Amino acid sequence: MAGEDPYIMGVSDPQMFAMDQLMGMSTIFNNTGYITSDLPLRTADGPYLQIIEQPKQRGFRFRYVCEGPSHGGLPGASSEKNKKSYPQVKICNYVGPAKVIVQLVTNGKYVHLHAHSLVGKFCEDGVCTVNAGPKDMVVGFANLGILHVTKKKVFETLETRMIDACKKGYNPGLLVHPELGYLQAEGCGDRQLTEREREIIRQAAVQQTKEMDLSVVRLMFTAFLPDSNGGFTRRLDPVISDAIYDSKAPNASNLKIVRMDRTAGCVTGGEEIYLLCDKVQKDDIQIRFYEEDENGGMWEGFGDFSPTDVHRQFAIVFKTPKYRDVNITKPASVFVQLRRKSDLETSEPKPFLYYPEIKDKEEVQRKRQKLMPNFSDGYGGGSGAGGGGMFGGGGGGAGSGFSYPSYGYSAFGGMHFHPGTTKSNAGMKHELSNSTVKKDEESSDKQSDKWDTKHDVKVETVEKNECRTSGHNEEKEDASLCCKDEGNKPKCGCQDGLFLEKAMQLAKRHCNALFDYAVTGDVRMLLAVQRHLTAVQDDNGDNVLHLSIIHLHRELVKNLLEVMPDMNYNNIINMRNDLYQTPLHLAVITKQAEVVEDLLKAGANVNLLDRHGNSVLHLAAAEGDDKILSLLLKHQKASSMIDLSNGEGLSAIHMVVTANSLSCLKLLIAAGVDVNAQEQKSGRTALHLAVEQENVPLAGCLLLEGDADVDSTTYDGTTPLHIAAGRGFTKLAAVLKAAGADPHVENFEPLFDVEEDVKDDDDDEGIVPGTTPLDMAANWEVYDILNGKPYIAAAAVSEDLLSQGPLRELNESSKQQLYKLLETPDPSKNWSTLAEKLGLGILNNAFRLSPSPSKTLLDNYKISGGTVQELIAALTQMDHTEAIEVIQKALSSSQRQSHQEDNTIEAFPSLSPTSFAKEETGELYNHKFQDPESTCDSGVETSFRKLSFTYSDSLNSKSSITLSKMTLGYRKAQCKAVIYLTR
């Protein structure tokens, strides 16, 4: 650090005057680049000034005039709660009277006067003057305050400060302009400045105003020793302190995470988290996730959000990044922190947990993996009969299940039934009442008769006298099963006979059904006698319809729908399991279009919701299944559900856009969906979501086919154009602008901090403009498009070229550029991370041993059959735009032919927005920047365009009026042209 800025070390330089004198010979106007703080150190022999206590860099607030003086002066770097200290300097190698002045200077590479003022004891006109000596040559500054000048008064204040410095000889050659280094030192009285000197000062003030950072200052100490006449004209070399940051400035305050609503997320990322923090600068902040492994490797990812997702500089809504390995089997602990882009300063990291992906959220796979029933478990005899027979007891004995003494079906007397717990009846949650059983039996008999008549099957009855008992011992066992009353006392009559009669009736029905099935081969014969059991649910709440759909038995579902009892038909077909899923929900989830159609014909209710508030329309939209969605939309009751929001506040159109399904979106639009419906969390429309995902086809479909409101706003007044401009989406900005989006719409986010920029400005009191898309433009290309400049499409690269080897079409110079870019020490953009993204991370140790790891990596990738498309996708995940540009430029140049069409909007002269405006008004709408650098101020985002040339223009823009008069047909034609170019 000493080699970079010796002033910070507090040691002066005797060569300064010589350098000032040399640079004073320059006649170049406004060239302040000659004066830098990078001067060599020296060993002082004569008097010199030294800082012995630096000021505290952070935690001190700059105050405005209306706020009054600060509570306590600027503390020293070593100041503590019970031991205060303040900035101090010492004049070394000298004893006697002296005068020390303190001026505020900038923190950049070049030292200039700062517009802020020092206030407090011994301070006048922004400069502090203190007498030192004659014995104690240590000077302390215990009451220094810093007065913050408003941005609108920077030029005026700075010019006055420069004139004063030149008149009094306070380092004018260093702080103002090298041509003014000849002006006398303090003590010779003020002198009048010439017109040329004033012009130099004015030009210097104009230039330095553009570059000044109002959130940070430094102290410059200059000592003057008396001459032979007693005047303080002998100036010692000045020394400059460490930087002092305004505690209220978002780009200077300490970063701190205050609260997060979630501390864990899925490895696939994309989950929304609300984060509260201390004041941040919305275009200069990142949310960094990182993990360090045992071998010193580093993984990092960044939360996804735009400037519109930062609320009042204190809250950020972002989506988590994907973890480096989405196939983990146990949770992975990482850290999350805030990081400032400009200086890479970070907050204290907080723990975050990535858990494995839950691929079976609807528990379909889990239920499919349950042990399938074995045929031997249901067959009589042995442990199998007892363990899994339909009426088997728990003992597992040979006689505990059904007993078949012979294959003659007349021996029904040999059957006996033992009530016991089995797999079949353990999970029955809904027991049928006696009345229900009786009705079902009657219905069953009628249904059996129907099937008998239909298939012309003769059913012979079995006479009671053909039944015979199986023995005296079994009769004793049956007798032991007599029912007991509440007092556990045996009733007078045993119900063995009644139980046996019921069992015989059941056996007859099943026997007849088995005969019918044997004759017809129609499984419905077997299902018909058990249809009253379709209401029974297992441990998961699933009935037979649920399970048939889960296991993909489409024919069985169809058969069950045909034989189910009429009385409970609707209740059974719309029955919900423990996850509140109906059979129709499961059919949509498992993507069985035929089953969905069968259920709808059978009368399934499309209005029922699952545990998350999702209707079947939501589920089909989320899956992006246009075939199933088409079937559902044809249902007569679907229209009432098409705009319904689920538990997350999303309607079907929002989920379709999130799923990136253009075909489903067209179906919803044709069905009359409200394309301007707002999701209930933040008020985003489908167009907002399409822009967030940078999906041009979806946005175009919404605008052209859905007539979406291009200037629809969220709860905070943000339009889709705000999002496109803030994220730097050039294509979408062009599409929205062509569709008539207004770049001057203000959202509710103030362009500047009311408490800071409006102070001492009565004229603007109460008028705080919001932020427009022009203010949020992330790059100059987007800004020019918003101002009406035609969109110029990049040279297209054919799919054939993308499918070739990654380096085949790159020339040698492009390869070298790519190698160099991948050799960067930045772990997020070097060859090692790229290898991980390309699936070659296992070879990193081998690559590291080669002379050029990046070259070796890409050579291996080429040999393995990798494509340019995959390479660009990996680089996109790394956010390595420079490498992507090198590849695309090389591929485009190799493909360029002489007959290549000029892909610009000029190819559509009748559709050009500028030509249209010119025809109507005779003028072109085109802003020109007068200030290429944005002004940094406390509480103001540096990338936001200045109010002077955006907000004021929006009030007087003729072209904005012209655009508002464009017909819908013209806008659609213009939008189509731009969408065509963005392909």
Curated annotation (Swiss-Prot):
GO MF annotations in UniProt: DNA-binding transcription factor activity, RNA polymerase II-specific; NF-kappaB binding; RNA polymerase II cis-regulatory region sequence-specific DNA binding
ANK repeat placement: 540-569, 579-608, 612-641, 648-677, 682-712, 716-745, 769-799
SUPFAM superfamilies attached to this UniProt entry: Ankyrin repeat (SSF48403), DEATH domain (SSF47986), E set domains (SSF81296), p53-like transcription factors (SSF49417)
Domain of life: Eukaryota
Record domain Death: where: 804-891
Cystine bridges: none
Biased composition regions of type Basic and acidic residues, renumbered to the chain: 428-454
Cited PROSITE patterns: ANK_REP_REGION (PS50297), ANK_REPEAT (PS50088), REL_1 (PS01204), REL_2 (PS50254)
Motif Nuclear localization signal in this chain: 365-370
Gene3D superfamilies: Ankyrin repeat-containing domain, Death Domain, Fas, Immunoglobulins, Rel homology domain (RHD), DNA-binding domain
GO cellular component term, pick one: NF-kappaB p50/p65 complex
Domain RHD span(s) in chain numbering: 47-372
S-nitrosocysteine found at: C66
Region of interest: GRR: 377-397
Free-text note on domains in this protein's UniProt record: The C-terminus of p105 might be involved in cytoplasmic retention, inhibition of DNA-binding, and transcription activation. Glycine-rich region (GRR) is a critical element in the generation of p50 (Nuclear factor NF-kappa-B p50 subunit) by acting as a proteasomal 'stop signal', which leads to limited proteasomal degradation of the C-terminus, while generating p50.
PANTHER family per UniProt: NUCLEAR FACTOR NF-KAPPA-B P105 SUBUNIT, NUCLEAR FACTOR NF-KAPPA-B PROTEIN
Subunit structure: Active NF-kappa-B is a heterodimer of an about 50 kDa DNA-binding subunit and the weak DNA-binding subunit p65. Two heterodimers might form a labile tetramer.
Name of the featured protein: Nuclear factor NF-kappa-B p105 subunit
Organism of provenance: Gallus gallus
This protein's encoding gene: NFKB1
